[in-house]
Swiss-Prot record:
Catalyzes the tRNA-independent activation of glutamate in presence of ATP and the subsequent transfer of glutamate onto a tRNA(Asp). Glutamate is transferred on the 2-amino-5-(4,5-dihydroxy-2-cyclopenten-1-yl) moiety of the queuosine in the wobble position of the QUC anticodon. It comes from Psychrobacter arcticus (strain DSM 17307 / VKM B-2377 / 273-4). It is an enzyme of class 6 (ligase). Binds 1 zinc ion per subunit. ATP binds at residue 271. Zn(2+) binds at residues 104, 106, 154, 158. This is Glutamyl-Q tRNA(Asp) synthetase. A motif ('HIGH' region) lies at residues 16-26. Its EC number is 6.1.1.-. One of its GO terms (molecular function) is metal ion binding.
Length: 335
């Protein structure tokens, strides 16, 4: 008899941070990830990334859940709250990730002073070289950006200091080589996590866990296979891959980074830019608008559930491929 192999069910997720209500940018991410994973008969998980207790608010969490339900974006399984999983993250930090971590007492002020000195030295050296070669230097004496020190790379002052892990921040060493992956929307990607993020802070002195570390562990523990999220998170991806590998967790098999939603002025919609919260009083109209913004075929104006079923049946990533942004001006007046 032929041997049949059962492939694991695809699992996607939406993981908002409750530092504000959902806006059109976060809605399109939720909608795209929901329709895509459901179109391949997968599960859609909801995880609230609320490790930042200073900025996250329970009332925003509650509103996010209300808005998703009003739009028919119903999640599978129980909602995961990262604020309730701190012990899990610390267990990984103190066990399988321990060889990669070290305590650090460097303040931002100290590092800022160090980088400023390095940049001044680089500018002086560059000017001297230019003079020696009889090359004219611009009056403003600006230095090519590729010659400046990389401020993302922590200079590892504390890597051998053997400081207390409970009284200082904790850094994790990221690999200094290129990691590649195929992005289903943006194409083949290569990045060096050490060059991009350096030895990132995994846990602050007050115990707060870095969201990249928490997301990496949770994605592995939840056995997520497909991640569809905003393009602004793309630079974090190789760090996440390396952390999951170091933690001996299954890595993500399918990545998709969506183009960013921009207002008519070309500015990315975000909480920092005071993007307006979505209004779910007319959920069907809002879904139709978001689907059109995502380049999907029109759906019949109906209940959210029926509209989503139609959107799922005809979901297509092709209109999004290679796109860096989607501007609301293209369909302004139809919201």
């Amino acid at each position: 008899m032929p041997i049949t192999r059962t492939l694991p069910q695809p699992i996607g997720r939406f993981a908002p941070s409750p530092t504000g209500e959902l806006h059109l940018g976060s809605l399109t991410t939720a909608l795209a990830s929901f329709c895509h994973i459901k179109s391949i008969d997968g599960k859609w998980l909801l995880r609230i990334e609320d490790t930042d207790t200073e900025r996250c608010d329970r009332q925003f969490t509650e509103q996010i859940l209300i808005d998703l339900e009003a739009l028919g974006l119903n999640w599978d399984d129980d909602v995961i709250f990262q604020s309730e999983r701190i012990d899990i993250y610390n267990d990984y930090i103190s066990s399988v990730l321990r060889p990669l971590t070290y305590s650090c007492q460097c303040s931002r002020k100290r590092l800022e002073r160090y980088w400023t000195q390095q940049e001044q030295q680089t500018a002086l050296t560059d000017a001297n070289i230019s003079t020696d070669l009889s090359v004219s230097v611009n009056n403003d004496k600006r230095v090519d950006s590729h010659l400046l020190p990389n401020r993302q790379r922590y200079p590892r002052f504390c890597i051998k200091a053997n400081l207390s892990p409970t009284q200082n921040k904790l850094r994790i060493q990221l690999p200094d080589y290129c990691i590649g992956f195929n992005d289903g929307i943006q194409g083949i990607q290569w990045d060096n996590p050490q060059q991009t993020l350096g030895d990132m802070v995994a846990r602050r002195q007050d115990g707060m866990i870095n969201y990249i570390l928490a997301a990496s562990l949770d994605d592995g523990l939840q056995q997520v296979t497909h991640i569809m999220r905003g393009l602004d998170i793309l630079p974090m991806t190789t760090a996440q891959i390396s952390i999951m590998q170091a933690a001996r967790l299954p890595t993500i098999s399918h990545w998709y980074h969506l183009p960013l939603i921009c207002n008519p002025d070309g500015q990315k919609l975000s909480k920092q830019n005071l993007a307006q919260p979505i209004d779910t009083r007319h959920p069907s109209k809002l879904l139709a608008y978001a689907l059109k913004l995502l380049g999907q075929l029109p759906v019949d104006h109906d209940t959210p559930e029926r509209m989503l079923n139609q959107a799922i049946s005809q979901w297509d990533n092709a209109p999004l491929q290679g796109r860096q942004s989607l501007n609301m001006a293209t369909i302004v007046g139809e919201k």
